């Protein structure tokens, strides 16, 4: 493990949540690739009761949503208020994210 991996792994959830808040897809992609050796959960809830996916949907960041799903974010998880990523996207008027999440849900459930 490199020195960068060690510093990232020392507080992986905090580092991850901060990267999501920045919304920088390239930075987050690099971070996610480097955190594969860490005890790390892409579906963890932050202090506001949101997962990284929920936060990315709130921000309307489709690129980040796709990246998080690629790395295992569960689109079915509900936040503290009981809203899924799809609910948040629909309420926020993020039609591109709504369509993406519906498509992912359709294929992940095996529906045709």
From Swiss-Prot:
ANK repeats lie at residues 48-77, 81-110. Keywords: ANK repeat, Developmental protein, Notch signaling pathway, Repeat, Transcription, Transcription regulation. SMART domains: ANK. GO terms for molecular function: chloroplast targeting sequence binding. InterPro entries: Ankyrin_rpt, Ankyrin_rpt-contain_sf, PP1_Regulatory_Subunit. Disulfide bonds: none annotated. One of its GO terms (biological process) is branching involved in blood vessel morphogenesis. SUPFAM superfamilies: Ankyrin repeat. The keyword RNA-binding does not apply. The keyword Protein biosynthesis does not apply. Belongs to the NRARP family. Regulates independently canonical Wnt and Notch signaling by modulating LEF1 and Notch protein turnover. Stabilizes LEF1, a pivotal transcription factor in the Wnt signaling cascade, by blocking its ubiquitination. Involved in angiogenesis; involved in intersegmental vessel patterning during development. This is Notch-regulated ankyrin repeat-containing protein A. The gene is nrarpa.
């Amino acid at each position: 493990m490199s020195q960068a991996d060690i510093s990232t792994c020392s507080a992986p959830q905090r580092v991850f949540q901060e990267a999501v808040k920045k919304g920088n897809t390239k930075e987050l992609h690099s971070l996610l690739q480097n955190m594969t050796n860490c005890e790390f959960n892409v579906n963890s809830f932050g202090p506001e009761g949101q997962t990284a996916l929920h936060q990315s949907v709130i921000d309307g960041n489709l690129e980040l949503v796709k990246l998080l799903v690629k790395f295992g974010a569960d689109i079915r998880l509900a936040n503290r208020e009981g809203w899924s990523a799809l609910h948040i996207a629909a309420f926020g008027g993020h039609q591109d994210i709504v369509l993406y999440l519906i498509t992912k849900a359709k294929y992940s459930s095996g529906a045709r």
